[in-house]
């Protein structure tokens, strides 16, 4: 029994790849530095647009967690394509959008974690941990709890 528990802890500390797609270089660097400083076992990469992600994926790089902002996305089909190519990738929506309809749409596309850019560091790290350890779990920043009824239907 103890072996099972220790192996579970070890697997949650395995080096995983986090990709951040953020067009605002300053915000992207802040998020990247936050994760690197507090979760040094995670490998963090920063890109400016989602078009670049496909060359990484086709280059056989596993992307375990993807932070993105739908505002910077010109085509939501990219998210569906990312999930089709790599269904195990956990998607974290990190945005200023608080609209329930946007959250509902993203959830239907396979996004399970939602933070705002105003979220404090602890919330962002908690969302990262959930995506890392429980990839199919739903995580909502408390500022987005009004969206929860839409996602439970």
Where in the sequence are the language-model features?
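Acidic, metal-coordinating helix/loop segments flanking the phosphotransfer/catalytic sites
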Residues: 48-65
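Two-component/phosphorelay signaling modules centered on CheY-like receiver
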Residues: 25-47
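Conserved acidic carboxylate
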Residues: 22
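CheY-like receiver
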Residues: 135-153
């Amino acid at each position: 029994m103890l072996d099972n528990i220790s192996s579970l802890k070890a697997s949650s500390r395995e080096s995983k790849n986090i990709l951040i797609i953020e067009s605002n270089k300053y915000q992207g660097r802040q998020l990247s530095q936050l994760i690197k400083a507090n979760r040094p076992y995670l490998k963090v990469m920063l890109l400016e647009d989602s078009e670049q992600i496909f060359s990484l994926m086709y280059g056989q790089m596993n992307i375990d967690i993807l932070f993105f902002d739908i505002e910077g996305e010109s085509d939501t089909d990219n998210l569906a394509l990312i999930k089709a190519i790599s269904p195990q990738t956990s998607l974290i929506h990190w945005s200023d959008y608080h609209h329930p309809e946007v959250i509902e749409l993203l959830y239907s596309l396979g996004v399970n974690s939602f933070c705002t850019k105003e979220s404090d560091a602890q919330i962002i790290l908690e969302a990262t941990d959930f995506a890392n350890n429980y990839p199919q779990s739903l995580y909502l920043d408390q500022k987005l709890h009004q969206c929860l009824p839409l996602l439970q239907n």
